[in-house]
Amino acid sequence: LACYFNVFPGSDRTYVMLEGLKENMPKAMALFEEILADAQVNKEAYGNLAGDILKKRTDAKLNQGQNFNKLIQYAIWGPKSPATNVLTTAELQQMDPQELVDRIHKINSFDHKILYYGPEKPQAVLDIIKQYHNVPEQLQPVPAAIEFSQQETPENRVLLAQYDAKQIYFSAVSNRGEKFDPAIQPTLNMYNEYFGGGMNAIVFQEMRESRGLAYSAGTFLITPSKLKYPYVYRTFIATQNDKMIDAMKAFDEIINNMPESEKAFNLAKDALITRLRTERITKSDVLWSYLN
């Protein structure tokens, strides 16, 4: 059929995707619906999957960057976050795969949207969906999701995660609870590009190129991924253990007294303009941008 499907479970939605040739869409969709309705348990495959997940977790603990990323997640979200909303080792090992298969069988019974990107006419797509998409007469509401909150930082706090390595990772996180404001986005983008973005940014040039105090350094104000989330300000340094104090002092100085550079400013401005001129939302990304 020259088609394939995939499943994407996320922190706030799960979706299945079917792609292929236009002329094979009816047959592909019929087979796809059959798989969803009649998926069978394979205990050996589940055992291998659980083993792979646990192996990846064990390997991640041996990676300094992975450990540091989890510390950042804790600083931003607190003890309950999307990163911690996973099955424990015991839950994975004791899980009955039939429970997972039952969830697959029920996926069409919940409220859902259908997105189509392709050459077929709208009415033809609707006819195929009506013929092959198996849904009950009454759809069920999607179960309420777990709500996670990004934690404000009203006072200074230090979080330490011991890791035996020859360099340290340092980050400062600030959340004042400020919600998304489209009016400040141009200034925010310019600040990130000029001050903390890439290799031409002030932070990188000062910390690595001019002072030799860091392997990598950056700072940026993160735009909320959803309207319910606030802006989060983050800094980052990777440096040798014996340069930690000097690097942190220099970083504070640069942040509180931002150096001015006409050359760096123009480079940042040109980079933003080039990005705006060349970036396009195309194809199926138009649909996803609308949903998001």
Where on the chain are the PLM-derived regions?
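Charge-rich, well-structured scaffold segments of protease-associated domains
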Residues: 1-142, 211, 216-292
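His/Glu-based metal-binding/catalytic segments typifying zinc-dependent metallopeptidases
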Residues: 141-202
